[in-house]
């Protein structure tokens, strides 16, 4: 018998049977095999011969398909689908967590990455673009983390669950100024855009010097934190001034001489340069007169107040928010810190005619015929900075009035070094809002680095402003005092625990403070005002968002309030 050929064997097979999975009409489209596919799904296996439709995974009950979800099902991966449309009302609470390792190096502000100002090279970048919601953060420690937006099961060692317990209601703070109906919003700038700005500016030049300074008492530098170094904080009556830009006669003279385009004080300029670090609401007044811009603060503005633990994770609560200690509320702590910073620099200097250094000109604000108290040790440096770019047709200069608090002899060369003097205050390290602060009395001597690091975390905006003010004034040294309550329950009596000495630029580097970013913010806001019509504008930091709003306001805004405040006492006297 002749052997059968392969063709005969194949033709003898039943026509109804075939190798492989059974052909179903549900997976056919016009006679072509078809599998539903969503562009949001991850590509997986082409065929799975081990998993059946009714097969349980690893012997584990599915419980309504809660713990097991087939990732090959059409549209099963919609949570990570970049093409999915998110509801607008869910954007405020939406969060994405990524487990990929992120590099510590930041991308330069080049093409498509915000505005970069560079003298000599022009403006390398384009306009700042509003980013999307795709900012990923590495959360939790080592171990497995759950990346389901609903929380999921807890991670491994060092991990934690992210669920509804993390959705704490945001505090609703009040704005620093009441926005009137007649105010018009001109610009809105979020902090993410401000953080990309950069302008390289020099050290500036001195124009005028006014006032006088006393020598610093070096005895306050001995053994910070030691029991023998504690001194009671005394209240001294001295005449001090905080004159705003438009009311400064020296700045007015410099404006008349066309010495610069922008005029400000170190108080308002430091707030603008450190805007991205702020949490509380604040406001600045911009007045454009011709081609000149004056940056002012309102009378009674919170810029005159010193905040306490503004940047703490659990900042001090208001009385209305359940704080039972009225002396530890934000408003009371601001008053206490402001008082301490007013009297502390007066106590740590040696007041005598032999320990006095006079500046080129006399005090610009003190009037002996009117004042009964002697003037405080204070020197005013009027300094000019160049904010120009290569593309500018005309140079853009800024003049700022800076302040110095004392002077000290250099131990090596005997030259005078100028100081700024500030003070941190401790209220109660066990109270709500302390931000995990250490006990200064027991830790300042042995762990002063940890104490200072905690203060940098809880008061980053305040300390950044102090560092900026010292750099603007070209101070050689910044003295930082540590003042604590004599009794945590009494906010009237205080004791000086010690004083630490820092170089302003070194201190700024420790805080990762980018001065070029601050100058970029100033230049950007000034450019906005110069592009608008002459008039008055108010820049307000949103009380509950990382956002700045620039309003155009009537020319007599805030002036009418001052007139009403002056008339009110007269009416009461007549009654």
Curated annotation (Swiss-Prot):
Keywords: Cytoplasm, Initiation factor, Protein biosynthesis, RNA-binding. Residues 302-316 are annotated as: RNA gate. InterPro entries: eIF3d. GO terms for molecular function: mRNA cap binding; translation initiation factor activity. Residues 36-66, 103-177 are annotated as: Disordered. One of its GO terms (cellular component) is cytosol. Residues 39-59, 163-174 have a biased composition (Basic and acidic residues). Disulfide bonds: none annotated. GO terms for biological process: cap-dependent translational initiation; formation of cytoplasmic translation initiation complex; translational initiation. It is found in: Cytoplasm. Pfam families: eIF-3_zeta (PF05091). Residues 109-144 have a biased composition (Gly residues). mRNA cap-binding component of the eukaryotic translation initiation factor 3 (eIF-3) complex, which is involved in protein synthesis of a specialized repertoire of mRNAs and, together with other initiation factors, stimulates binding of mRNA and methionyl-tRNAi to the 40S ribosome. The eIF-3 complex specifically targets and initiates translation of a subset of mRNAs involved in cell proliferation. In the eIF-3 complex, eif3d specifically recognizes and binds the 7-methylguanosine cap of a subset of mRNAs. Component of the eukaryotic translation initiation factor 3 (eIF-3) complex. HAMAP family: eIF3d (MF_03003). Belongs to the eIF-3 subunit D family. The RNA gate region regulates mRNA cap recognition to prevent promiscuous mRNA-binding before assembly of eif3d into the full eukaryotic translation initiation factor 3 (eIF-3) complex. This is Eukaryotic translation initiation factor 3 subunit D. It comes from Phaeosphaeria nodorum (strain SN15 / ATCC MYA-4574 / FGSC 10173) (Glume blotch fungus).
């Amino acid at each position: 018998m002749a052997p059968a050929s392969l063709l005969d064997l194949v033709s003898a097979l039943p026509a109804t049977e075939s190798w492989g999975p059974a052909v179903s009409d549900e997976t056919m489209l016009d006679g072509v095999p078809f599998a539903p596919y969503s562009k949001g799904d991850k590509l997986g296996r082409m065929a799975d011969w081990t998993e059946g439709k009714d097969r349980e995974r690893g012997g584990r009950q599915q419980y309504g398909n809660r713990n097991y979800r087939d990732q090959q099902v059409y549209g099963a991966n919609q949570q990570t689908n970049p093409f999915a449309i998110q509801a607008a009302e869910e954007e405020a609470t939406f969060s994405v967590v990524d487990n990929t390792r992120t590099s510590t190096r930041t991308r330069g502000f080049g093409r498509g990455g915000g505005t970069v100002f560079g003298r000599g090279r022009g403006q390398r970048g384009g306009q700042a673009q509003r980013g999307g919601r795709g900012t990923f953060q590495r959360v939790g420690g080592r171990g497995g983390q759950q990346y389901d937006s609903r929380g999921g099961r807890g991670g491994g060692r060092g991990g934690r669950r992210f669920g509804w317990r993390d959705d704490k209601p945001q505090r609703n703070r009040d704005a620093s100024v009441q926005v009137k109906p007649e105010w018009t919003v001109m610009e809105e700038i979020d902090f993410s855009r401000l953080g990309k700005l950069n302008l390289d500016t020099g050290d500036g030049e001195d124009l005028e010097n006014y006032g006088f300074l006393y020598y610093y008492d070096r005895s306050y530098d001995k053994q910070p934190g030691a029991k023998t170094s504690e001194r009671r904080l005394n209240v001294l009556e001295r005449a001090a001034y905080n004159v705003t830009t438009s009311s400064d006669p020296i700045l007015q003279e410099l404006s008349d001489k066309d010495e610069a385009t922008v005029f400000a004080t170190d108080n308002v300029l430091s707030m603008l340069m450190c805007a991205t670090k702020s949490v509380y609401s604040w406001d600045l007044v911009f007045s454009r007169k011709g081609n000149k811009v004056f940056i002012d603060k309102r009378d009674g503005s919170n810029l005159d107040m010193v905040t306490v633990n503004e940047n703490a994770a659990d900042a001090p609560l208001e009385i209305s928010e359940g704080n039972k200690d009225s002396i530890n509320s934000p408003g009371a702590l601001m008053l206490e810190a402001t008082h301490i910073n007013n009297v502390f620099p007066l106590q740590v200097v040696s007041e005598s005619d032999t320990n006095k250094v006079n500046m080129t000109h006399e005090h610009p604000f003190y009037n002996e015929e009117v004042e009964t108290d002697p003037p405080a040790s204070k020197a005013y440096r009027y300094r000019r900075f160049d904010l120009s770019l290569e593309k500018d047709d005309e140079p853009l200069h800024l003049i700022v009035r800076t302040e110095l608090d004392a002077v000290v002899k250099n131990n090596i060369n005997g030259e005078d070094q100028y100081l700024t003097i500030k003070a941190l205050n401790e209220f109660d390290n066990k109270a709500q809002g302390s931000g995990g602060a250490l006990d200064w009395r027991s830790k300042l001597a042995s762990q002063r680095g940890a104490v200072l690091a905690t203060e940098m975390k809880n008061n980053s905006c305040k300390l950044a402003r102090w560092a900026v003010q010292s750099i603007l004034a070209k101070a050689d040294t910044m003295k930082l005092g540590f003042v604590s309550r004599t009794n945590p329950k009494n906010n009237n009596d205080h004791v000086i625990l010690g004083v630490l000495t820092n170089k302003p630029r070194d201190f700024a580097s420790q805080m990762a403070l980018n001065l070029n970013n601050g100058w970029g913010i100033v230049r950007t806001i000034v450019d906005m005002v110069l592009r608008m019509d002459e008039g008055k504008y108010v820049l307000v930091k949103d009380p509950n968002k990382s956002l700045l709003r620039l309003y155009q306001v009537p020319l007599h805004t805030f002036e009418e309030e001052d007139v009403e405040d002056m008339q009110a006492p007269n009416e009461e006297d007549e009654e």
